[in-house]
């Protein structure tokens, strides 16, 4: 039994397989990201392509932290994302709410000037800052 498919059909099937594979890999990458903290020292674990990698850094090595996305619904954050630039040239992207809140909590406790700089980047009124403070107070990392 031999199946003869036209070339456009074969290309379409391969494209669908590729799209499904890339969606699955993105979900695996997102679920594998993790930020751990101990006394101002961080370990950020992520998957780059297929290999698992870790970046170790201290809160004092953070050069710049940019708030890239924030969505608030019903008085709480649904989405909050950060890009963190380190002194040695590395950059990290925190996409999970838990990781972002952990980073902000350590900034508030250990490096207040960075925390104030992050708060000044929030393009909104005091309501957003009060929601952020409430979330940080309730956060148990």
Show which residues each predicted segment covers:
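Conserved beta-hairpin
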Residues: 21-57, 64
